[in-house]
């Protein structure tokens, strides 16, 4: 009987380890598939993208909300000229999305698979365009959403160090005002998601949670 329980525990431990490794195995398979079967698509995305090492290009990008994020996405898109390298960079970004989602939202081990959802949606959004890639007006579409999502997690990590209500409201105000010109809608995403998460945080007064949530929504609407 004791031996049976020991075998069951070992099997359970092994399955848990394999489950934790599954996202990394999927990432490796994604990189291999893109490098081998997605070469033409990745090269076409790079061919339709534009990035210039020029101050005028950056100034024009800065005039549009989220333009600098787009410029950063366009910069990384250049690496798709070598499909294996561009796919590797994107895979690393997606793994960062997975890992930081777990940490930002304090996802428990039994629900860690949920952290794959944002990365999976980013993959679907990029790889389901088909011929639509020829009519896309955003040459930065391949990398910019992933980078924007990562940036939108910053308020979550900041809230861990800023505990006071007014300190958090001040941070959200600065974040929204300074982040919107650089990140565009992803600055709003960070504000709203952090405000929503604050509603579920234990150890704080209900009035404070709703005040913070309302402040975040008002900042986005204003």
Listing of model-derived features with the role each one plays in the protein:
Residues 1-31:
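Start-transfer (signal-anchor) and selected internal transmembrane alpha helices
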Residues 19-43, 218-221:
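Transmembrane signal-anchor helices characteristic of membrane glycosylation enzymes that use polyprenol
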Residues 31-88, 93:
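Membrane-interface coil-to-helix junctions
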Residues 31-35, 117-128, 173-184, 215-222:
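Aromatic-anchored segments of alpha-helical transmembrane domains
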Residues 44, 62, 66, 110-165, ...:
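Membrane-interface micro-motifs in multi-pass membrane enzymes
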Residues 91-108, 151-158:
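Transmembrane-helix motifs of polytopic, lipid-linked glycan transferases
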Residues 101-112, 161-166, 199-210:
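Membrane-interface helix-boundary motifs at transmembrane edges
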Residues 161-201, 216-221:
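Transmembrane helices and adjacent periplasmic/lumenal helix-loop junctions
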């Amino acid at each position: 009987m004791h031996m049976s329980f020991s075998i069951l525990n070992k099997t359970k431990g092994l399955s848990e380890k394999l489950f934790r490794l599954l996202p990394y195995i999927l990432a490796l398979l994604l990189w291999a598939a893109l490098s081998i079967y997605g070469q033409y698509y990745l090269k076409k995305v790079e061919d339709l993208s534009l990035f210039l090492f020029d101050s005028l290009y950056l100034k024009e990008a800065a005039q549009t909300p989220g333009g600098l994020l787009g410029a950063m996405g366009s910069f990384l898109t250049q690496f798709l000229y070598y499909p294996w390298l561009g796919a590797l960079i994107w895979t690393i970004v997606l793994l960062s999305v997975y890992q930081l989602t777990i940490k930002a939202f304090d996802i428990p081990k039994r629900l860690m698979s949920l952290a794959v959802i944002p990365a999976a949606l980013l993959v679907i959004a990029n790889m389901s365009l088909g011929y639509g890639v020829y009519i896309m007006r955003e040459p930065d579409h391949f990398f910019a959403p992933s980078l924007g999502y990562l940036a939108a997690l910053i308020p979550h990590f900041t809230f861990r160090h800023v505990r006071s209500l007014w300190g958090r409201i001040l941070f959200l105000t600065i974040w929204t005002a300074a982040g919107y010109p650089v990140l565009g809608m992803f600055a709003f995403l960070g504000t709203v998601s952090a405000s929503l998460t604050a509603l579920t945080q234990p150890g704080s007064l209900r009035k404070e949670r709703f005040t913070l949530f309302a402040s975040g929504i008002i900042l986005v609407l204003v």
